[in-house]
Amino acid sequence: MSESLKNCDKIRSFPITERYRNIDIIYEDNHLLVVCKPANMLSQRDRTGDHDLQSLLKQWLKDRYRKPGEVFLGLVQRLDRPTRGVMVLARTSKAASRLSEQIRKRIFKKEYLAVVLGKNIKNRELIHHLEKDASRNMAVVTSGQAEPVGSSGKPGPGGPRGSRLAVLDVTHLETQGEHSLVKIDLKTGRFHQIRAQLAAEGTPIAGDNKYGSKVSQTRHLALMCHKIAFEHPTRRESMQFTAGLPEEFPWDKFRRPR
């Protein structure tokens, strides 16, 4: 099955209270919950104590079905706090285990979209070595382009000790003025990988001041998980969910008239 959503900003599919107004619930069954996480919301609880998607959805399930006690909701896929987009959560431990296995085997597919600063964007594979700078909460590119060394992600030639191989594909979709819309397919999953690698190529994501984007009227980081595709954990049918572009700048430069 395939479901499409216009953006990640408004609830449409299910009755919902004011408390959960910023979360789009795209699909629900006894095994899965597919949602569109808004920008600047945590995927799961951390030490800040700020609202997080997983906890809010657990409470939503309790309220919706009047469930006493603890509700299981497994987070098998995560998005960084500033990144919006489609996520699937598991309502049973069996579904969580099977979805996690699909991620390990690369059966689970994720497609990201980003608006970057730059005009002459080439379709290419980006290969870097990244190291996490915990003091600044950033990923640092420690070497230039390098050859991959298999799927393990261990440093190859030119990769300093402590670094990890980061690989992604960039596809140019459209350019409007100083902004370009690109599609990103991750080959590895590293901390801040997309943000760090695009910035290293001189095309930082719009609104990403941490990685060198100039200050603009962009409200949020212009990065989203646009599409996910996987096999249903019990029915074994193909599932695909897509979120459309947000209505805010700079995404609105690439939205088509209705």
Where are these regions (language model features)?
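RNA pseudouridine synthases
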Residues: 1-258
